[in-house]
Amino acid sequence: MFAAGLAPFYASNFSLWSAAYCSSAGPGGCSFALDPAAVKKPSFCIADILHAGVGEPGPAAEGLVGASAALTAHLGSVHPHASFQAAARSPLRPTPVVAPSEVPAGFPQRLSPLSAAFHQHLPQQSPTQQQQPQQQPPPPPRAVSLQPPTSGTRVVPHHSGSAPAPSSKDLKFGIDRILSAEFDPKVKEGNTLRDLTSLLTGGRPAGVHLAGLQPSAGQFFASLDPISEASAILSPLSSNPRNSVQHQFQDTFPGPYAVLTKDTMPQTYKRKRSWSRAVFSNLQRKGLEKRFEIQKYVTKPDRKQLAAMLGLTDAQVKVWFQNRRMKWRHSKEAQAQKDKDKEAGEKPSGGVPAEGEREERSPSRSEGEAESESSDSESLDMAPSDTERTEGTERSLHQTTVIKASAAGALITASSSTSGSSFSFSSTSSLGSGNTHVGSASSLGGNCSELPSAHQPSVTSSPQSPEIAQAPLAGL
């Protein structure tokens, strides 16, 4: 085996054999004649091992000894379906096994999923594509990224004849379609329903074959009533109102499908109020009003009791009292403002006294001031006894002057001077000894002093005053 050239396959270190077996002039009969292109620094990378010497017939193929032919026969017996070319391949450069173009009759039919898919799609290729691997060397194997298989589907690798990937316009929710006019809020309802129908019935992604679904998965999807057929969703559209359709879409298509509901159908979208306006009966309203007159703020136990009595909920009673307090507060403020305006209107008319009353009050006030001034002056000049005497004589003088004014025989003389004024009167009578009574009064500088006679008659004090009045008439 060592002389036949099989030793390098089992050596632990290839660098020991590279100089002897990879050079053009090796030791004795153990050297392999290689082409000039292969005479370079030996490399055992995966790419060099797979690609070196492929399709390049060595010019010194005959240089191989019989042991190399035996090696080729041995490899052919191990892999009967692989075509090995001894002249083109070196024992140091093993060639990967290529899948045969025709399956022999003795090949077992138990295939893996990938190989079965390969044989299933192989007849669809054109004859030129089938002859192409024979004319050209096979391309290097590429790393295939296999997606994890979903439940009920088989992963089918895309071959060279598969359809290209769909563009963004063909996708149901691609960027171009979302930005197009179909997702405009002013779009009609018919367009939305058409898109919904096409979404449910067709538009499956390329490369996914529903024929590969397992029976269990198919039965599972068929058991889902809301999304089994398009009619299950489109049937309520003619009978239910638009609001119910809106909520049905939201429940049926959560996530990215929600763009079909709120944004594309603004005419049908209408916000439903979370609460409705409560309508109270007359009995309930009277009960609430009566309780409000007694108690403006109701405690929680009282509120619950009142709600149970009137057949209302606790929240309804609470809201009613809040609104009623607000109304009562506004009415109270309006009444206070009205009273304030009314008082402001009455103040100019009732507060200022009239002109007639002002003129009537002024004379009386002046008279009172004059009396007070005269009394003050008299009290300063005279003693208290004189003041009393003067008051008594004033009353008697006033009475006698009235009597003398009516008498015909009375003589009244008056004279005035620069310093003051004085007047005197005299009368004669035949009573007694015929005494003449003379009275005089003078005022100087505002001071008044009166010196009446001791025998001056008065109406009240002397009963002979009528005779005094008649005496001048008899004498004349």
UniProtKB/Swiss-Prot annotation:
Pfam families: Homeodomain (PF00046). Residues 273-332 bind DNA. Residues 369-379 have a biased composition (Acidic residues). Residues 120-169, 328-401, 413-476 are annotated as: Disordered. SMART domains: HOX (SM00389). Residues 331-346, 355-368, 386-397 have a biased composition (Basic and acidic residues). PROSITE patterns: HOMEOBOX_1, HOMEOBOX_2. Disulfide bonds: none annotated. It comes from the Eukaryota. One of its GO terms (molecular function) is DNA-binding transcription factor activity, RNA polymerase II-specific. Induction: By TBX21 in developing as well as mature Th1 cells. The keyword Transcription regulation applies. Expressed in Th1 cells, CD8-positive T-cells, B-cells and NK cells. Transcription factor required for TBX21/T-bet-dependent maturation of Th1 cells as well as maintenance of Th1-specific gene expression. Involved in embryogenesis and hematopoiesis. This is H2.0-like homeobox protein. It comes from Mus musculus (Mouse). The gene is Hlx.
